[in-house]
Swiss-Prot record:
The gene is thiI. This is tRNA sulfurtransferase. Catalyzes the ATP-dependent transfer of a sulfur to tRNA to produce 4-thiouridine in position 8 of tRNAs, which functions as a near-UV photosensor. Also catalyzes the transfer of sulfur to the sulfur carrier protein ThiS, forming ThiS-thiocarboxylate. This is a step in the synthesis of thiazole, in the thiamine biosynthesis pathway. The sulfur is donated as persulfide by IscS. PANTHER family: TRNA SULFURTRANSFERASE. Keywords: ATP-binding, Cytoplasm, Disulfide bond, Nucleotide-binding, Redox-active center, RNA-binding, Thiamine biosynthesis, Transferase, tRNA-binding. One of its GO terms (cellular component) is cytosol. It catalyses: [ThiI sulfur-carrier protein]-S-sulfanyl-L-cysteine + a uridine in tRNA + 2 reduced [2Fe-2S]-[ferredoxin] + ATP + H(+) = [ThiI sulfur-carrier protein]-L-cysteine + a 4-thiouridine in tRNA + 2 oxidized [2Fe-2S]-[ferredoxin] + AMP + diphosphate; [ThiS sulfur-carrier protein]-C-terminal Gly-Gly-AMP + S-sulfanyl-L-cysteinyl-[cysteine desulfurase] + AH2 = [ThiS sulfur-carrier protein]-C-terminal-Gly-aminoethanethioate + L-cysteinyl-[cysteine desulfurase] + A + AMP + 2 H(+). Coiled coil: none annotated. One of its GO terms (biological process) is thiazole biosynthetic process. It comes from Salmonella choleraesuis (strain SC-B67). Signal peptide: none annotated.
Length: 482
């Protein structure tokens, strides 16, 4: 099988040296992502496209899906590469490929040509289009807005029959811009802002301020791992978790109620800046949107920025909540965010929307900054790829099984779309579907006399959810890994 990768248009308008660098980085990213599917896979870069060739036909859909999620790719063409002799040969091959697709449909033919030939692109379009129209009685030509567009590419003595076109996410390849540190909470905003910086070519590391205990951190780990695995797995990134409960306790005790929200955000920026400096990261990323909550007025954002020299990027600053939720739905983080607990809002009952710098600084004079230094020093820093391994260690009390007994039921916790695309069928045992994001509210409704074997494709989500359910007091859960 063969795929032709078309570059994001902004890459093609760069200078020659920058364009070549971007293409080289994108080629490396594609190799890093796809090597898990086919070790014999070949990735070849050209001036205006990248070729991907693979032998394992069983991995075709997985490879195609992975390519659509790599930043820097505008669209992917799945092609059949065959030799040809003349225009009539091109027509015959096009007829064999597209006959079934065109029956009862309107169509047009579009040809791109490279190399020296005795015919032009328009001549091929007319010849092939006329031939298809004659040989498929139920089809008819329509040059504007047809049901089907027959795409052909001619390069020297090779014909590329385009079997399908699939849109990528665009943007710049990860690694073409400098690293950033995303302040991730697991909600709608931070997930979308992290994705937007990945799409713009940044390697995004994650910093999580834990205000709600182990269950909250597990949920945020899921979001960070999902974003990395889906859009940024070409690069290694860090997940830094800081236990911020001592800081919150100090704020509740020492800071005036109305100033708590701004002071908390200033403490977070101070801590994140220390982490960024430690790892040589150039900027922080937040999901703040202007006026969304009390701490996100211009006055308060300016006061928050003042505590650090580190650049703070806010890609969602002008977005409304509905737009952000729609983006979260598109990238697949909406369901995570809907079930994520929100802790920041409970810290202040009557927050100020226009904090005064002198008053904020006066309140902070009462704060014991050694507490902040201590929690940063004790921050838990892991390679995001190790989250699965760490989860396996943490869920040591949750048994992992490869078989099943008479009282066991397999619980497929994949998302609804994944279940529809690839239903799980196991002989000799019942399989029940319950997406991971409904476990917290719906697992208790299941028959608790049964033993539930949690299953997902890679085993990461099933381990995380098993730990969560154990913490909630459910002892009848195991992890199923056949």
């Amino acid at each position: 099988m063969k795929f032709i990768i078309k570059l994001f248009p902004e890459i093609t308008i760069k200078s020659q040296s920058v364009r070549l660098r971007f293409i080289k980085i994108l080629t490396g990213n594609i190799r890093n992502v796809l090597k898990h599917y086919d070790e014999t896979l070949a990735v070849v870069r050209h001036w205006d496209n990248i070729e991907v060739r693979a032998k394992d036909e069983n991995q075709r859909l997985a490879i195609r899906d992975a390519l659509t999620r790599i930043p820097g790719i505008h669209h992917i063409l799945e092609v059949e590469d065959v030799p040809f002799t003349d225009m009539h040969d091109i027509f015959e091959k096009a007829l064999a490929q597209y006959r079934e697709q065109l029956e009862g449909k309107t169509f047009c033919v579009r040809v791109k040509r490279r190399g020296k030939h005795e015919f032009s692109s328009i001549e091929v379009e007319r010849y092939v289009g006329g031939g298809l129209n004659q040989h498929i009685e139920s089809a008819r030509v329509k040059l504007t807005n047809p049901d089907v567009t027959v795409h052909l590419e001619v390069e020297d003595d090779r014909l590329l029959l385009i079997k399908g076109r699939y849109e990528g996410i665009g943007g710049f390849p990860i690694g073409t811009q400098e690293d950033v540190l995303s302040l991730i909470s697991g909600g709608f905003d931070s997930g979308v802002s992290s994705y937007m910086l990945m799409r713009r070519g940044c390697r995004v590391h994650y910093c999580f301020f834990n205000l709600g205990g182990a269950a909250h951190e597990i949920g945020v780990r899921q979001v960070a791992h999902y974003l990395w695995n889906r859009f940024g797995s070409s690069h290694r990134v860090r997940f830094v978790a800081i236990n911020f409960e001592p800081v919150v306790g100090e704020i509740l005790e020492k800071v005036d109620d109305g100033q708590m929200g701004v002071v908390l955000k200033r403490m977070m920026v101070r801590a994140a800046s220390k982490v960024a400096e430690r790892y040589g990261v150039q900027a922080l990323v937040t999901g703040e949107a202007l006026g969304q909550v009390s701490s996100q007025t211009l006055t308060n954002l300016r006061l928050i920025d003042n505590v650090s020299d580190t650049l703070i990027l806010r890609p969602l600053i002008s977005y409304d909540k509905g737009h952000i939720i729609n983006l979260a739905r598109q990238i697949g983080t909406e369901d995570f965010a809907r079930t994520m607990p929100e802790y920041c809002g409970v810290i202040s009952k009557s927050p100020t929307v226009k904090a005064i710098k002198a008053k904020i600084e006066a309140e902070e004079e009462n704060f014991d900054f050694s507490i902040l230094d201590k929690v940063v020093e004790e921050a838990n820093n892991v390679d995001i790829r190790e989250i699965a391994q760490q989860t396996q260690q943490e869920v040591v009390e949750v048994e992992t099984v490869s078989g099943f007994g008479p009282n066991d039921v397999i619980l497929d916790i994949r998302s609804v779309d994944e279940q529809d695309d690839k239903p799980l069928k196991v002989e000799g045992v019942d399989v029940v579907s319950l997406p991971f994001y409904k476990l917290s509210t719906k697992f208790g409704d299941l028959d608790q006399s049964k033993t539930w074997l949690l299953w997902c494709e890679r085993g990461v989500m099933s381990r995380l959810q098993a730990l969560y359910l154990r913490e909630q007091g459910f002892a009848n859960v195991k992890v199923y890994r056949p």
